[in-house]
Amino acid sequence: MTKVGLRIDVDTFRGTREGVPRLLEILSKHNIQASIFFSVGPDNMGRHLWRLVKPQFLWKMLRSNAASLYGWDILLAGTAWPGKEIGHANADIIREAAKHHEVGLHAWDHHAWQARSGNWDRQTMIDDIARGLRTLEEIIGQPVTCSAAAGWRADQKVIEAKEAFHLRYNSDCRGAMPFRPLLESGNPGTAQIPVTLPTWDEVIGRDVKTEDFNGWLLNRILRDKGTPVYTIHAEVEGCAYQHNFVDLLKRAAQEGVTFCPLSELLSETLPLGQVVRGNIAGREGWLGCQQIAGSR
């Protein structure tokens, strides 16, 4: 039996309004619990369009057929008009998710975090995280105990800033296994549970065809030597590719693969490490990557 952490990122208004209810229904039918990370502030994701001037981002949008994958409402959100606030407008959906799944903060403003947090000072970052946590806690009526940085935009500054909130764990980086990042003080920080497997948009049209993706991914899961963690997006697997996701769950069950919330992957003893800036094939720009203590 192979146990895989299932992380669901919710980046947009449409992903929350349409994708999450569909995913909740799918997961219920398959008796699966997951960790769902919500963006709760304004939906300004359309402002990423300026990144089309960067060849790597343009190629990603073309090979993943972004217009049909996400829809023009997502691709243009927050461009010619202020982005709609996601959280309170979809409070009932988020509360329903929290009844059955582990719920955490993805971002207050996903676009702002992904585009600008790398240049924020620590207090600006703390204020932004606090705003998101406060909003999500108002919606679900209970403390939020986990978070996942938007776009995996995380480095030492993010690790230090999140210590102020005493969360149970964060999932801010890519890597191989859960660990505790070393703080500037030399003490171990809040546990990190890295994503180990590629996302749909990172590999479609580059490493694998759409129709071959599920078999390709299951092969990666079964060969994973660490602690497998897979991320789906409400805007993708909850919308245009929900049938592909259902097929993945059926095939996974046949292969003895089970999915669980990320917190079930934690153990009392974890290795030490750091979160450093790095790059992942198929994703434009830097993102947080796990570095085991003592390695370079």
UniProtKB/Swiss-Prot annotation:
Molecular function GO labels: hydrolase activity, acting on carbon-nitrogen (but not peptide) bonds, in linear amides
UniProt-listed Enzyme Commission number(s): 3.5.1.n3
Pathway in which this enzyme or protein is active: Glycolipid biosynthesis; 4-amino-4-deoxy-alpha-L-arabinose undecaprenyl phosphate biosynthesis; 4-amino-4-deoxy-alpha-L-arabinose undecaprenyl phosphate from UDP-4-deoxy-4-formamido-beta-L-arabinose and undecaprenyl phosphate: step 2/2; Bacterial outer membrane biogenesis; lipopolysaccharide biosynthesis
SUPFAM superfamilies: Glycoside hydrolase/deacetylase (SSF88713)
BP GO annotations: 4-amino-4-deoxy-alpha-L-arabinopyranosyl undecaprenyl phosphate biosynthetic process; lipid A biosynthetic process; lipopolysaccharide biosynthetic process; response to antibiotic
Keywords: Antibiotic resistance, Hydrolase, Lipid A biosynthesis, Lipid biosynthesis, Lipid metabolism, Lipopolysaccharide biosynthesis
Domain NodB homology residue range list: 2-260
Catalytic activity: 4-deoxy-4-formamido-alpha-L-arabinopyranosyl di-trans,octa-cis-undecaprenyl phosphate + H2O = 4-amino-4-deoxy-alpha-L-arabinopyranosyl di-trans,octa-cis-undecaprenyl phosphate + formate
Hydrolase among keywords: yes
PROSITE patterns linked: NODB
Gene3D superfamilies: Glycoside hydrolase/deacetylase
Record has Hydrolase as a keyword: yes
GO CC terms: membrane
Superkingdom of the source species: Bacteria
Reported function: Catalyzes the deformylation of 4-deoxy-4-formamido-L-arabinose-phosphoundecaprenol to 4-amino-4-deoxy-L-arabinose-phosphoundecaprenol. The modified arabinose is attached to lipid A and is required for resistance to polymyxin and cationic antimicrobial peptides.
Record-stated family: Belongs to the polysaccharide deacetylase family. ArnD deformylase subfamily.
Protein name, entry field: Probable 4-deoxy-4-formamido-L-arabinose-phosphoundecaprenol deformylase ArnD
Taxonomic source organism: Shigella boydii serotype 18 (strain CDC 3083-94 / BS512)
Classification lineage: Bacteria, Pseudomonadati, Pseudomonadota, Gammaproteobacteria, Enterobacterales
